[in-house]
């Protein structure tokens, strides 16, 4: 099973990705991690990517896509969920073309929808548990509100990421994501428009539901009961 997942920052995309990974035993692959791994290992693609990153420039698609495909084929032999790529319509088209050439089948595309202002509020309200950063805490979401100043799961210390409070940075990220002409949503919709032709199932889920409600919907749409995961 091979899956692309889309959702704005603040939608809980990462949390749902981890839950899907555990339920299906597939590999959760994040584009940012791929860059870091290639750079730390000193691969040829990693060296090329680093030369752009060090200059504060975007890594070209002709470096990024081979890097991602290589990771999918090596780490995702039993299935994968790709998170964080593609980010725009051009990348979607190039990724699709590359997957066709390599014979890589895309089975599902997940889009978690969330109004922009709600997504922004959630980012600002996010709190990170120092003991375990997989423990969800958010002052803007009733179902996962912290226990005062402590983690709702383990009562550990909570911290606030400075970039979560930078409204200008949040707005820039969301400008890219919510752009339906050339941005990340246009990439998601590119695959949606091809879903019938390539037998790819497109799943739309309401990100304003609780983590458990979203999980239940996704697992059922992906073909298993949430009771057995």
Swiss-Prot record:
Instruction: Cite the PANTHER family for this sequence.
Output: NUCLEOTIDE KINASE
Q: Give the originating organism.
A: Lawsonia intracellularis (strain PHE/MN1-00)
Q: Name one GO molecular function term.
A: ATP binding
Catalytic activity from the UniProt record: AMP + ATP = 2 ADP
Query: Any notes on this protein's domains?
Result: Consists of three domains, a large central CORE domain and two small peripheral domains, NMPbind and LID, which undergo movements during catalysis. The LID domain closes over the site of phosphoryl transfer upon ATP binding. Assembling and dissambling the active center during each catalytic cycle provides an effective means to prevent ATP hydrolysis.
Its lineage reads: Bacteria, Pseudomonadati, Thermodesulfobacteriota, Desulfovibrionia, Desulfovibrionales
Q: What does this protein do?
A: Catalyzes the reversible transfer of the terminal phosphate group between ATP and AMP. Plays an important role in cellular energy homeostasis and in adenine nucleotide metabolism.
Q: Which GO biological process annotations does it have? A: AMP salvage
Family as reported in the entry's similarity comment: Belongs to the adenylate kinase family.
EC class (word):
transferase
Q: How does it assemble?
A: Monomer.
Q: Which domain of life is it from?
A: Bacteria
Sorted UniProt keywords: ATP-binding, Cytoplasm, Kinase, Nucleotide biosynthesis, Nucleotide-binding, Transferase
Sites binding AMP sit at 31, 36, 57-59, 84-87, 91, 161, 173
Name of the featured protein: Adenylate kinase
Q: Which gene encodes it?
A: adk
